[in-house]
């Protein structure tokens, strides 16, 4: 272990003394997460939110996306697909990295060389995409109406994605993990992003949920410690 890594670890240990017993405000937690990130890349700032959900019930399966006011700090490559040339032209102007008609799309999917992070499609293309669900699904590339990636207005969807969106999905345990930005972003911008995501999820509380809805909320960076945040239900 290098001296630099050891020194960084010592700094982290000093900063996170008794962290398990502390509850932070949102801005304090983000500041702490940034201070304890010593990886060599621009780490993500992530939110983990434990919700009182029974995801076996259809109305308690939360999934969607929300536009963040200050973006995510990530460069997202978007593929837009439609069989309408006008739609593709508008999507290209909106910032799509790749545009594909049905023939182009089938060629891309058959090659399994996916040089994109998100796919946006108009609903008419879903029968074609459905054939490749077993390939796209596990990679998280299958478009979904709940995340706004299946839409008649693909240009608008591309524009929103390029500006920055946070996707959220409750797992079987009712936990949502989502990124709100990068360590290099200002704390104020990250706080604003976090508030938008948290408020969105708060408003989606299913009517059938009994008791405390938001049970635990933490902020962390990639490979960094977690900091617990005071929740206002």
UniProtKB/Swiss-Prot annotation:
One of its GO terms (cellular component) is large ribosomal subunit. GO terms for molecular function: rRNA binding; structural constituent of ribosome; tRNA binding. InterPro entries: Ribosom_uL1_bac-type (IPR005878), Ribosomal_uL1 (IPR002143), Ribosomal_uL1-like (IPR023674), Ribosomal_uL1/biogenesis (IPR028364), Ribosomal_uL1_3-a/b-sand (IPR016095), Ribosomal_uL1_CS (IPR023673). Keywords: Repressor, Ribonucleoprotein, Ribosomal protein, RNA-binding, rRNA-binding, Translation regulation, tRNA-binding. The keyword rRNA-binding applies. GO terms for biological process: regulation of translation; translation. The keyword tRNA-binding applies. Disulfide bonds: none annotated. Belongs to the universal ribosomal protein uL1 family. HAMAP family: Ribosomal_uL1_B (MF_01318_B). Part of the 50S ribosomal subunit. Binds directly to 23S rRNA. The L1 stalk is quite mobile in the ribosome, and is involved in E site tRNA release. NCBIfam families: rplA_bact. This is Large ribosomal subunit protein uL1.
């Amino acid at each position: 272990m290098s001296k630099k890594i050891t020194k960084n670890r010592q700094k982290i240990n000093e900063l996170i003394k008794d962290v398990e017993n502390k509850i932070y405000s949102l801005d304090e937690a983000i500041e702490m997460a940034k201070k304890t990130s010593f990886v060599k890349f621009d780490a993500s700032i992530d939110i983990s939110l434990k919700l009182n959900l029974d995801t076996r019930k259809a109305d308690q399966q939360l999934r969607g996306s929300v536009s963040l006011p200050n973006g995510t700090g990530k460069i997202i490559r978007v593929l837009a697909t439609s069989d309408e040339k006008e739609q593709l032209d508008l999507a290209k102007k909106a910032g799509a990295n790749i545009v594909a008609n049905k023939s182009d799309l089938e060629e891309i999917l058959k090659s399994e060389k996916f040089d994109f992070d998100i796919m946006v499609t108009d609903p008419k293309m879903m029968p074609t995409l459905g054939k490749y669900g077993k390939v796209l699904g596990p990679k998280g590339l299958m478009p979904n109406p709940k995340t706004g990636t299946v839409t008649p207005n693909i240009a608008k969807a591309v524009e929103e994605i390029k500006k920055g969106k946070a996707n959220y999905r409750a797992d079987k345990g009712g936990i949502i993990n989502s990124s709100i930005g990068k360590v290099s972003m200002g704390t104020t911008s990250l706080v604003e992003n976090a508030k938008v995501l948290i408020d969105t999820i708060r408003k989606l509380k299913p009517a059938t949920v009994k008791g405390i809805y938001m049970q635990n909320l933490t902020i962390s960076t990639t490979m960094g410690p977690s900091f617990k945040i005071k929740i206002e239900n």
